[in-house]
């Protein structure tokens, strides 16, 4: 169904995630060629901080400034809001200032993570 990037020896790019998740770009459409190697899906930012290493994409239904701050601390390049969630303009500006792409999809978390996994994107190692 989806291209298997890892089998072809290619990294996925943010623009590929947009197609896979039928997502809308919220901010930083100038960074859509950014490569991503791993992903994490969680609504608990404490879990992201405790168990995630070197992730590139964060999928979440949580919409508050803590999401951007957590993503920044974990050196993530892209935040995907699931279940049709939309951040406020203040949160969007926070991400823009930190060079983070924000996307939104109507898909649920489980479906979004599954589609990205099917396309070859994997989760990172836990501590």
Language model features with spans:
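Short, structural beta-strand-to-alpha-helix junction motif
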Residues: 13-15, 108
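Feature captures the catalytic cores and cofactor-binding loops of soluble hydro-lyases/lyases
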Residues: 33-34, 38, 42-57, 61-127
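Short secondary-structure boundary micro-motifs
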Residues: 9, 27, 32-34
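Generic low-complexity, intrinsically disordered sequence content enriched
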Residues: 8-10, 25, 98
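Short secondary-structure junctions
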Residues: 23-29, 123-124
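Short, Lys/Arg-enriched N-terminal segments with co-localized hydrophobic residues
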Residues: 1-11
